């Protein structure tokens, strides 16, 4: 691959002594399949590649040198004097290959011959500007005007010998538009001018027609009937303010108060309530308020239980006694007398004696009265055998006390405040006790109950007197 590149580089550089080709560097017939032969060929290829690279580098340097020389010549020609400019025409014509007087100019031939000699003498210093100036100065050393003078004979022979010169062809082409293009452009410009003139005339005619028309006022635009901008801004501001207040109130309503604020509000409410109660207490006189009846009053006494048991036994024996009494025969007078005589020795004394009654005895009806059907129908003992009444006297007293308590409660309801009190429960308790007499007995009169009744009576009398006085005053 390196040999191919080297050969390509050598072919691209004209005028060289030797050319490295692919056939000279690589001969496949000489290659053996041994390692030593392979490495030897590899070294040869590397050496050939290095030699080709050196040649390419030298060619590149020569090319750069020629470019520097041409640039220096162009710079010195532009800075030369006016006399040199007048004499530069024959020199330039001598350097050009197309001029016929190339053989006559000896000075120019010397300059062209000196260039390669100078390149051979100083190949490393050509790139500098000082060398270029020295070279230009040496070109004008052997210059003479006589070399450029021509005689008439020479001119005639030159005219005969010379062929017809060719026309001068400039190297820079100046573009000139075609006549057709120019004509098309003029026609286009003329059409655009005519169009503009036509539009101006139309616009002028329209303006004249508008001016000639009779004036007619247009209706009032609708935008004038709309409210002013200041009014709209004011309305929006009011609406925004109301919305802000509404949202603020909603936020305050949804906001939970702090604990100490709620506690202070509760304390303030309690203080106000106490002040109101104090004012009411000062205005109204203090009313009597009795304590509730103790519960032990409704409890049955200790001697009620044996009485209940005795009465329960009597209630069981009374039906049997009634049946025996109805079925037993009437006793005789002798037996009756013996039964009635307490001193009779025949009858034993004690609790086993039985009383014998005659049909004519007035006490028979009295004896049968407790066992009548009316008494058994009204007596709740037979209906509820577990609950028994006590004596009639005790029940009357109890009913009287309960009636007094009810009357006192009704009187107190009229003069009492609307809020409920513990005394309201006493009528229900008394009614329950009256409905269940077997479990509760009516309360016994005490000193406190008697004092309460007297106070109720006194207050009732005072109220009646006050009502009578007010009615008389009216």
From Swiss-Prot:
Main location, first listed in the record: cytoplasm
* Single GO term (MF): identical protein binding
Any one GO CC term of the record: photoreceptor connecting cilium
Q: Which residues form a coiled coil?
A: 188-250
Q: Which tissues carry this protein? A: Expressed in the retina and kidney.
Q: Where is this region: Disordered?
A: 78-126, 185-210, 308-364, 412-474
At what sequence positions does the UniProt record place the cross-link Glycyl lysine isopeptide (Lys-Gly) (interchain with G-Cter in SUMO2)? Answer: 397, 413
Biased composition of type Polar residues is found at 325-335
Q: Does the keyword Ribosomal protein apply?
A: no
Keyword annotations of the record = Cell projection, Cilium, Cilium biogenesis/degradation, Coiled coil, Cytoplasm, Cytoskeleton, Isopeptide bond, Ubl conjugation
Its subcellular locations are:
Cytoplasm, Cytoskeleton, Cilium basal body; Cell projection, Cilium; Cytoplasm, Cytoskeleton, Microtubule organizing center, Centrosome, Centriole
- Gene Ontology BP terms: cilium assembly; cilium organization
Compositionally biased spans, kind Basic and acidic residues: 450-468
Region Required for interaction with CFAP418, annotated ranges: 274-454
Basic residues composition-biased segments: 422-431
Give any Pfam family that matches: FAM161A_B
Q: Which InterPro entries match?
A: FAM161, FAM161A/B
Sequence similarity: Belongs to the FAM161 family.
What the protein does?
Answer: Involved in ciliogenesis.
Q: How does it assemble?
A: Interacts (via central region) with CFAP418 (via N-terminus); the interaction is direct. Interacts (via C-terminus) with microtubules. Interacts with LCA5. Interacts with CEP290. Interacts with SDCCAG8. Interacts with FAM161B. Interacts with POC1B. Interacts with CEP78. Forms a microtubule-associated complex with POC5, CETN2 and POC1B. Interacts with CCDC15.
Q: What is this protein called?
A: Protein FAM161A
The protein's organism comes out as Rattus norvegicus
